[in-house]
Amino acid sequence: SGRVRLIMKRADLNKIKTGEILVANFTMPDYVPAMKKAAGIITDDGGITSHAAIISRELGKPCVTGTKFATQVLQNGDLVEIDGEKGIVKIIKGK
């Protein structure tokens, strides 16, 4: 679990703090330093062969891809729990 950090543009990558949950439309190679800091990753797009899923597996971090609208529902500071095995994101406490 961790606090949400929305990454809506590249400039947001510098805002992520260690232990936050990176939430983005998708990830790309330049997201990897931020992904290393994150406790987990959630993306709107993608699947088991997406960049986010592959890098998350390599880093041993929980990841849920293909949520369709996580970036619209979640807000910076929300406390969430990720179950990467089942593909479930639970909002524990809103901002």
Identify the meaning behind each predicted range.
Residues 4-11, 15, 19-20, 25-27, ...:
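Acidic, glycine-rich flexible loop/linker segments
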